[in-house]
Amino acid sequence: MAAPTASTPAYAILRDRLRLAILDGSWPPGTHRTLGALALEHQVSISPVREALLSLEGEGLVEIRQHRGAIVPLLDAKLFADLYDLRGALQSLLARRAAERVTPAQLDGIAAHAAAFEAAAKHDDAAAALRHNESFHAAIDGVAANPQAQAVVAARTAFVNAVRLRLGYGPARMLAAARQHETILEALRARDPEAAAEAAFAHVESARRDLLERFAEEQGRKPRP
């Protein structure tokens, strides 16, 4: 998640704060907050609160209720599995389209992001790896030139990244992801749409399995009521 700047819209700053509150449990699942209460708490007007909640609703983090503000649904394994189902379908589509139209210059850019991710993985730098992973996939998605699919993926990337930062990676997961990036890159270089789609889907499935394992471990460590 990029640090806010002077030009960052108020709703985006608030959205990031609320996302963090949801993920760290300070806005607990099953509880609702009104627009007015959120505006007062964060010293902003109603308008950025409404925009922030709409953005978080698009990520699946809140449900907006008429006259009740927003409620945080239960963050469970099914939610994460569903998100990765969506990512797998869309990122395989985008990789297929990218393989059909990628240029040598674009390949160089994608390769640079893959190399940066691998370097971060070798240093076990999860935060840097996440940034470079996002850049790698965004570069591929941009080549695919399907703004509708890109928008859906992008709307959920910040949530998935925030969850990943909280849960961490399993042993050798980042290095495995680096190898998977190289497989995707090889398919793009070969201009092989099917191979690119298959490699992208396998990459998402591998990430899904690792994140669900980390989530199960975290749930197992929580004290029982």
Report residues per predicted region.
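Short alpha-helical transmembrane interface motifs in multi-pass membrane proteins
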Residues: 76-77, 163-167
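Conserved amphipathic alpha-helical interaction elements at protein-protein interfaces in regulatory
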Residues: 24, 28, 55, 142, ...
